[in-house]
Curated annotation (Swiss-Prot):
Signal peptide: none annotated. The gene is yae1. It comes from Botryotinia fuckeliana (strain B05.10) (Noble rot fungus). May form a complex with LTO1. Keywords: Cytoplasm, Nucleus. This is Protein yae1. Residues 8-22 have a biased composition (Polar residues).
């Protein structure tokens, strides 16, 4: 029989030879490369409508389209609202603006007329009285033009953002019907200058009925033509303005 022969082990550590690593060929990975793992049916994303249980990894266009539609809808609403509001505001403010414009034009027109007449008299007279009156009336006319500018008449001091006047109109607190001429007459600037103009009218003894053309039997000197006939001939028939 053979005996097991015990071979003495050397005192040194026995080291196994390491095998050299074989380089991996990647030349065909683009053709035979590994594919992603198969989807698993774990039921987590079935509520999202994915039959394989895998959520949609692409960003959905729904939020972007929703935001776009909301923005376009907002713009369309603002555009439509502006067109309706602007037209409505214009219709409501046109009447009052027209009355204010007529009264302001009358104030400036009378002062310019007085200034022109005084200037002619001052040029024909050598007295200092007419020269002083000329300077006074010219200054008065210039001040009226400055204070009755559009931006000052419609300043925030007199009007609110909604277009309602801030100044007191007679009869408004009592519940009486207030019309545009009442509002225009109560405007502080117009009230001031209409008072000044009235003083000038009294000072120079002006006939306002004659200046406003209310005489029915006005005859042109040398022509004997009535004013009504002239108006019809030039196509400017006089009409009453009811505000």
């Amino acid at each position: 029989m053979f005996r097991d022969t015990e071979f003495p082990l050397s005192s040194g550590t026995f080291t196994m030879p390491q095998s050299e690593s074989t380089p991996h060929n990647d030349d065909f990975d683009d053709v035979f490369g590994s594919e992603p793992g198969s989807p698993t049916l774990d039921g987590r994303d079935m509520r999202d409508g994915d039959m394989f249980g895998v959520g949609n990894t692409e960003i959905s266009d729904i939020p972007r389209l929703k935001e776009k539609h909301e923005t376009e809808g907002y713009r369309d609403g603002v555009t439509k609202g502006k067109s309706e509001s602007v037209q409505k505001g214009f219709d409501e403010g046109y009447g009052l603006g027209a009355v204010l414009g007529l009264r302001i034009g009358k104030i400036i027109g009378i002062l310019e007329g007085i200034s022109g007449a005084v200037s002619v008299s001052a040029s024909k007279s050598e007295g200092e009285e007419w020269t002083k009156e000329k300077s006074r009336v010219e200054e008065l006319s210039n001040n009226a033009k400055n204070e009755l500018k559009t931006e000052k008449v419609f300043a925030r001091e007199w009007w609110g953002e909604d277009g309602i006047w801030k100044f007191e109109v007679p009869g408004e607190k009592e519940g009486k019907d207030v019309v545009f001429p009442d509002v225009a007459a109560a405007h502080p600037l117009l009230k001031k200058w209409e008072g000044i103009v009235e003083e000038e009218i009294q000072k120079w003894s002006l006939d306002m009925d004659l200046m406003e053309g209310n005489e029915e039997d006005v005859v042109l000197v040398g022509q004997h033509v009535k004013a009504d006939a002239v108006e019809q001939r030039i196509g400017a028939a006089k009409t009453d303005l009811n505000w």
